[in-house]
Amino acid sequence: MKIHVLGSSAGGGFPQWNCNCPNCAAYRQGSPHLLERTQSSIAISGDDANWVLFNASPDILQQIKSFAKFQPNPVQALRDTAIRAIFLIDAQIDHTTGLYMLREHRQPLELWCHALVHDDLVTGNPVLNVLAHYCGIHWHDVPLTQSGFAMDGVPGLHFTALPLISNAPPYSPHRDQPQPGDNVGVTVVDTQSGKTLFYAPGLGEMEAHVWAAMQAADCVLVDGTLWTDDEMITLGASGKTSRAMGHLPQSGAGGMLEWLDQLPSSTRKILIHINNTNPLLDASSPQRHELTRRGIEVSYDGMDIDL
């Protein structure tokens, strides 16, 4: 299984266009310890030729330009792409706006998402209605069953979606009232090697079924949004805690680091969806050194993971 990190930042990217937090300010002043990051998205393939795009960020065009395997093959059709399917884990703006940029597709987009996500994308944020006037979509409802599913045109991979406690977008009727399917994590299994990835960029609470999936995975690529629960409040950037926004903080009791420390030593542990305010973005910070000590990696745009 090939996994390519297209974007590693939370919504807004890094640096965020209107932000003067210590990280964004230091980046603009030329700090060598901070990398530019686009908004969260990954690509997965079982054969290195047919790919699934997980989430379509507002930065999708830049991400495609940076990833040759997503670019049109000159020996194929005039209009070509290796993206065989798109999987949306939720209906958030930073995971769906990129769909507009894919409207030139020659056939309907093969779109996989839960019915609740689909509902939000034809009502509160009706991007799918707009796309009906362009390429259109072929929607596949993502089941929340242990048996999982395969995708046509994506050989060698099997997918299982797990409901997560996180938060729906502000335009959803389920905002602050989580419903199973608003947000999902995904287990992806390479059917030849048996290797398993668990992917959950938005994880607000650790439940038994989620923890079991993480323990069974060879690699976990999980929520790294904020370092402390009150990070945004302390900076004056928001009045909400990390958990209230649907993200487990890294530090503190019951935080992501405590959970990752309990995984088998053989498990590869990687953080993604990192907010611009998070001090771990600074490679010279005590927080980054703490992650290194614990054997936890920080994803970056262009990172490749082989399982």
Question: Could you tell me what each predicted segment is?
Answer:
Residues M1-H4:
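Extreme N-terminal starter segment of soluble prokaryotic enzymes
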Residues Q71-T81, H105-Q107, V127-D141, G148:
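A short alpha->loop->secondary-structure connector
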Residues G181-N183, Q192-T196, G204-G302:
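Cap/insert and terminal regions of metallo-dependent hydrolase folds
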Residues P15-A91, T97-E104, M206-A213:
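Pre-active-site segment of Zn-dependent metallo-hydrolases
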Residues L53-S57, A82-D94, C113-H114, F198-L203, ...:
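Active-site neighborhood of phospho(di)ester-bond hydrolases with catalytic His/Asp-centered motifs
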Residues I83, P108-L109, Y134, A216-D218, ...:
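Short, well-ordered alpha-helix to beta-strand connector turns
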Residues L116-P126:
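A short, active-site helix/loop in glycosyltransferases that binds the activated sugar's phosphate group
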Residues G12-Q39, P143-S242:
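Active-site-proximal loop/helix segment associated with metal-binding centers of metalloenzymes
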